[in-house]
Amino acid sequence: MFDFLTVARALTDENRVRILMALRQREMCVCQITGFLDLAPSTTSKHLSILRQARLIDSKKKGKWVYYRETDVEEAPQIVRGALAWVHSTLSDNGVVKEDQKRIAEILSREETLCSPEERGEDRFHSLEIHSLADKD
């Protein structure tokens, strides 16, 4: 019963369902997920934690980044397999999901690293200042 309730609760939030659909065919880091959802990183992390607790997604660390992907259906409990199949079949043609896929493709096609301005040779303050000035144009 615990697994059922945990999975059911995880699916009661639109952003968590959007994350689940985004991770269906790819792995993404928190910064990429935050980028397409347009949420605060802490909010995104909370959603990811709930999805992991429900065993709907897995994570792995690569260097200093953590990447998330949908749970391997072959290894998942029946309740998770059923939930994933239901979500995929119900929402694969959903307009929000299709828009998310476009935003994700754009985010993933960028050459710069979303997660760290320092990786691009910028300091955070300078990067924020440039972006906020650019937004005023």
Which role does the model predict for each range below?
Residues 2-43, 49, 66-75:
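N-terminal helix-turn-helix DNA-binding core of bacterial DNA-binding proteins
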Residues 45, 60-63, 135:
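Generic cytosolic/nucleocytoplasmic N-terminal low-complexity/intrinsically disordered segments
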Residues 37, 55-59, 76:
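Alpha-helical interaction segments
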Residues 74-137:
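C-terminal regulatory/oligomerization modules of transcriptional regulators
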Residues 17, 29, 57, 97, ...:
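A general structural signal for well-ordered secondary-structure junctions
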Residues 53-62, 69-71:
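Beta-hairpin "wing" of winged helix-turn-helix
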